[in-house]
Amino acid sequence: MSNLKRFDDEERESKYGRVFAVSGPVVTAEAMSGSAMYELVRVGYYELVGEIIRLEGDMATIQVYEETSGVTVGDPVLRTGKPLSVELGPGIMGSIFDGIQRPLKDINELTESIYIPKGVNVPSLSRVASWEFNPLNVKVGSHITGGDLYGLVHENTLVKHKMIVNPRAKGTVRYIAPSGNYKVDDVVLETEFDGEITKHTMLQVWPVRQPRPVTEKLPANHPLLTGQRVLDSLFPCVQGGTTAIPGAFGCGKTVISQALSKYSNSDVIIYVGCGERGNEMSEVLRDFPELSVEIDGVTESIMKRTALVANTSNMPVAAREASIYTGITLSEYFRDMGYNVSMMADSTSRWAEALREISGRLAEMPADSGYPAYLGARLASFYERAGRVKCLGNPEREGSVSIVGAVSPPGGDFSDPVTSATLGIVQVFWGLDKKLAQRKHFPSINWLISYSKYMRALDDFYDKNFPEFVPLRTKVKEILQEEEDLSEIVQLVGKASLAETDKITLEVAKLLKDDFLQQNSYSSYDRFCPFYKTVGMLRNIIDFYDMARHSVESTAQSENKITWNVIREAMGNIMYQLSSMKFKDPVKDGEAKIKADFEQLHEDLQQAFRNLED
């Protein structure tokens, strides 16, 4: 009995402080001299995870990322001496984490409970799974620096996990592991610098609040294709861009976020559910494994390229802030491998509300609507981590992080502080309209208030691949704007008294709205629209508009006037074909057949107008 150690952590004694006061998720601790800002601490006997957010004398204010019920004054507070960090390595893809990167699946298997117990301490990445490691052309004696690629792990059939030297490391290679199976904490590389030997495992730990370094930021030049016609044609985003989707409840923010995750041309998806309903995350978990993407003729589940950070509305409020940073750090890690990453944050409003709650508990001076004065700066520091970059190290590679942030303003009010601060930062604004959603027009994107500042950046891409597209888009915007101006006149005097050309504008605008902008994301033919189909549909609709106007204007002075009624009666079949272009299924029919069908319809159009004028 006497040889049993009474204290496991005698050497940790000096690292303990004491709880002084508790106020919800905010805990004040004393005897904390020597702590650093944003240091990770463990609070109470349950060892709850917390982060120091303020220091005064030897008092520290701690933001706790778990439920603090049961913490009493005098409980120990253990300092860890390191910032809140995430583990980066093989095993991230296909996983689901909470806001502080605890693996929810593993916790569920260990506890057999649907709840996360307090203070649970499970490693984020499995220490028992082994991965097949293949060294790249790095030999013993070669010099490497931070960001260099030294190995390859086939994480799954969609993602090749490239092993990156820690950005802060450098030196001469003393040992590189031969090809074989290794666990994430096995040493696969040893470097020597200034006589100091460093051992590297497949696992990297990185502080979440610190952006990962890059060689340089590059201008974006490639579109982020979403598969939603209204977004790809009128308000395109780029790979490495920032986008906000504000909208009231029930407008379809989550459906757009999920459609982006399913069908966008990204290599890796990080989906952060921040303070939203748990059902939405479970829907993602249920749907994604069933959905597949075809790469090189092989169909794969898209869950293999997705990682989820779930921080639902019933989880502690403070962890929402951490979940956003966890998500962006995971995104930057995959960007450094040379991938195009998309991060969905659903929703940044809940994150801002968490900031507001913590700020209120700290008795800080409130600004607009009770949000803290630094709300704009916090949002900017998050969105500025997006971008297309030249990655650190060799071989040379480019990667990008695109951020799509959903914003839920109360009552759909776009003058809300979070929405207005976000719109000052992001470059693309997809505004959702309650009236469109009530009319069951989905995606309910208001084409009059939305905008994209990336149009000019993408002109080269369009000129090279789809030269006719830019004038078509300009024409569509003109027609929709004209229709909006005419709609007031129509309500006053009716359609009959309009000029013939205005009647054509109204009808084509109706065709555009119902059969081009509207899209059923729950149908097999329309849940995803490739860009060639979008351009083909636009071309036929706009050519119909131009020819109809030309026919009416050229015969206006002659005896055989062509009016809109004449066109409509003569071209019933053509108009039906125009409105049913969206039913072409890109998976079943294939690109060549759809293009041929659209070309045939275009010829029929021209022939029909020739017959009409003769």
Swiss-Prot record:
Return the PANTHER family for the record.
H(+)-TRANSPORTING TWO-SECTOR ATPASE, V-TYPE PROTON ATPASE CATALYTIC SUBUNIT A
Q: What is the lineage of its organism?
A: Eukaryota, Metazoa, Ecdysozoa, Arthropoda, Hexapoda
Sites binding ATP sit at: G247, A248, F249, G250, C251, G252, K253, T254
Reaction catalysed by this enzyme: ATP + H2O + 4 H(+)(in) = ADP + phosphate + 5 H(+)(out)
| Name of protein | V-type proton ATPase catalytic subunit A isoform 2
Give the multimer and partner information.
V-ATPase is a heteromultimeric enzyme made up of two complexes: the ATP-hydrolytic V1 complex and the proton translocation V0 complex. The V1 complex consists of three catalytic AB heterodimers that form a heterohexamer, three peripheral stalks each consisting of EG heterodimers, one central rotor including subunits D and F, and the regulatory subunits C and H. The proton translocation complex V0 consists of the proton transport subunit a, a ring of proteolipid subunits c9c'', rotary subunit d, subunits e and f, and the accessory subunits VhaAC45 and ATP6AP2.
Top class in the EC scheme: translocase
Query: Where Phosphoserine occurs, residue numbers?
Result: S142
Task: Tell me the Pfam families matching this sequence.
Answer: ATP-synt_ab, ATP-synt_ab_N, ATP-synt_ab_Xtn, ATP-synt_VA_C
**Entry EC number(s):** 7.1.2.2
Superkingdom to which the source organism belongs = Eukaryota
Q: Which organism is it from?
A: Drosophila melanogaster (Fruit fly)
**Activity control:** ATP hydrolysis occurs at the interface between the nucleotide-binding domains of subunits A and B. ATP hydrolysis triggers a conformational change in the subunits D and F, which induces a shift of subunit d. The c-ring is subsequently rotated and results in a continuous proton translocation across the membrane.
Q: What does this protein do?
A: Catalytic subunit of the V1 complex of vacuolar(H+)-ATPase (V-ATPase), a multisubunit enzyme composed of a peripheral complex (V1) that hydrolyzes ATP and a membrane integral complex (V0) that translocates protons. V-ATPase is responsible for acidifying and maintaining the pH of intracellular compartments and in some cell types, is targeted to the plasma membrane, where it is responsible for acidifying the extracellular environment.
What biological-process terms (Gene Ontology) are attached?
ATP metabolic process; endosomal lumen acidification; endosomal transport; imaginal disc growth; lumen formation, open tracheal system; proton transmembrane transport
Q: Which CDD domains match?
A: ATP-synt_V_A-type_alpha_C, ATP-synt_V_A-type_alpha_N, V_A-ATPase_A
Keyword set, alphabetical order: ATP-binding, Hydrogen ion transport, Ion transport, Nucleotide-binding, Phosphoprotein, Translocase, Transport
Similarity comment text for this entry: Belongs to the ATPase alpha/beta chains family.
